[in-house]
Amino acid sequence: MLKKKKTEVYALGEHISMSADKARRVIDQIRGRSYEETLMILELMPYRACYPILKLVYSAAANASYNMGSNETNLVISKAEVNEGTTVKKLKPRARGRSFPIKRSTCHITIVMKDISLDDEYGEMSSLKKTRWKKKSTAMTYRDMYNSGGLWDKK
C-alpha cells in the first residue's frame, strides 16, 4: 500500500488582539492566492490586521519547507479562516466612584497552505486507482408530447 504524504501544512495564531471582522476583511483578500502574491498584497494593504496575518503566512511557509521540504513557489493558501476568541473585560475608573466596562475582543486565525506540486502527483495516482467504480450511463429517452398526442389520447 502506498503511504500518502501530507500536502497541507498550517499555522494557527490564537488570542490575537483585534476584532474578527477586521481580520476577515484582510483574510478574504488572500484566500486562494499563491505565497508570493500573498506577501505582496499583505505588505501593501494599509490595515493593522496585516502584520499578524503576515507573520502567520511566514510561519506556515516555514512549516512547509521544514516538514515537507517543499519550495515556497509551489505553495498556495488553500484555507484561511478567522474565528472569534475570548473577550477580555476590564473596568476603567470614572468620576464619582463609577466604572466603565472595556471589552477587548480577540480572534483566532488559521492559515492552511497546500503544496500544488505534491498535490498533482497524488492526484494522478488516485485517478488511476479509482477506475474500477464506473458509473452506469443513464441515457434519458426523449418523448415528444405534442406529436404523440400527449397523455390524454390514450383511452
From Swiss-Prot:
CDD domains registered for this protein in UniProt: Ribosomal_L22 (cd00336)
Q: Which GO terms describe its biological process?
A: translation
Q: Which Pfam families match?
A: Ribosomal_L22
User: Record's InterPro entries?
Assistant: Ribosomal_uL22, Ribosomal_uL22_bac/chlpt-type, Ribosomal_uL22_bac/org-type, Ribosomal_uL22_CS, Ribosomal_uL22_sf
Keyword set for this entry? Chloroplast, Plastid, Ribonucleoprotein, Ribosomal protein, RNA-binding, rRNA-binding
Checking PANTHER family in the record gives: CHLOROPLAST 50S RIBOSOMAL PROTEIN L22-RELATED, LARGE RIBOSOMAL SUBUNIT PROTEIN UL22M
- Record-stated family: Belongs to the universal ribosomal protein uL22 family.
Instruction: List the protein's name.
Output: Large ribosomal subunit protein uL22c
Please name the source species.
Solanum tuberosum (Potato)
Write the lineage as a comma-separated list.
Answer: Eukaryota, Viridiplantae, Streptophyta, Embryophyta, Tracheophyta
Q: What gene is behind this protein?
A: rpl22
